[in-house]
Amino acid sequence: MVTAAGQGIGRATAIAFANEGAIVWATDINQEALNTLSQEHPTMVCRKLDVRSPEEITRLATELPAPDILFNCVGFVHHGTILDCSEKDWDFSFDLNVRSMYRTCRAFLPGMLRAGHGSIVNMSSIASSVRSAPNRFVYGSSKAAVVGLTKAIAIDFVKQGIRCNAICPGTVESPSLEGRIAAQGDVEQVRREFVARQPMARLGRPAEVAALAVYLASDESSFTTGQTHVIDGGWNI
């Protein structure tokens, strides 16, 4: 089960899971993106899903009661400091970036527990409790909460066959990144600034993060839980 599978890291991870032989349930709020994904990868089960809707998540959990893997990839990057963040901005970011994961984990965990196993992978960010980043006030706050949520689930269910880990990427190529760059004026200068964050002097690729997600979801990482896995081109050295 993959959220935000329509583009970027979510799409790359859904494809990577499928390439490993998984039966992938790919979800996204964008039906057009799902249609494209389904056409290119007809073995996937594609479902439109608004992760801000408890009712939609509950309905999906009745169709897929016990997934082996849950990859929570949905997220939104709000630009600005605390002075740029209204209560509405705060509530939206936390609802989408954190509460959506609470909803999906709470919906799918019972089936995992009945099965006696399950791997949950949550998308956090290097801009979180790992380190700060300028103009990422509510984004960093919400992604820090994802780290806390991940560790809490990991410790509560570690003896019941459930693993829960978080991925903390640096700046990764994606349509959402392109949108943020375009919104800030001098496109080439802004792009150079994003690239300069990483000592490797390049942006990450969705497929690189997808490979880490596959590892954390698989039995190859069976002795790993409650961890924040940084993949950031050296940003946090």
Predicted segments with their positions:
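Substrate-binding pocket helix/loop in short-chain dehydrogenase/reductase
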Residues: 81-82, 89-94, 194
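C-terminal substrate-recognition "lid" of short-chain dehydrogenase/reductases
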Residues: 102, 202-231, 236
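Active-site helix of classical SDR
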Residues: 105, 142, 150
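Alpha-helical segment proximal to the catalytic Tyr-Lys
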Residues: 110, 155-156, 222
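Residue(s) in the substrate-gating loop at a strand-loop-helix junction
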Residues: 125
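Short, small/polar-rich loop/turn modules that mediate ligand/substrate recognition or access, typified
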Residues: 158, 163, 224-226
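Short, flexible catalytic-loop segment of classical short-chain dehydrogenase/reductase
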Residues: 169-179, 218
